[in-house]
C-alpha cells in the first residue's frame, strides 16, 4: 500500500496549488478528481460545435512581480511561466438582437 503525506480532494485551482506547494517541499501528494480533467471550474467544454471557456478570463496582477495575486505568487514560487495576453481595453458584447 502506498503512503502519502497529503491527500487532496479536488483538482481545482486551490487543490492544484496546495498539492504543488506540498510537493515542492518534498511531500508525497495524491490528488483525487471526480471529473475527467483537472482544473475545477477553470476548464472549457464543447457544445453544438462551439467551445466555451467556463473559468476566469481576467487574472488581475498576475503578469507583474511583485503581485498581490495569490495564484501569481504560487506560480512564481514554483518557477512556472504562463503565456499572458494583455487586454486592449474593455469590450462588452451585446446579444440582445439575437
Question: Language-model features: where?
Answer:
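Core beta-strand elements of the Rossmann-like FAD/NAD(P) dinucleotide-binding domain
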Residues: 2-4
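Glycine-rich FAD pyrophosphate-binding loop
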Residues: 24-46
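Gly/Ser/Thr-rich beta-alpha loop segments that engage phosphate groups in nucleotides
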Residues: 12, 17, 41-42, 51, ...
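Conserved small/polar residues in nucleotide/adenosyl-binding loops
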Residues: 96-98
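Anionic group-transfer/hydrolysis microenvironments
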Residues: 7, 35, 55
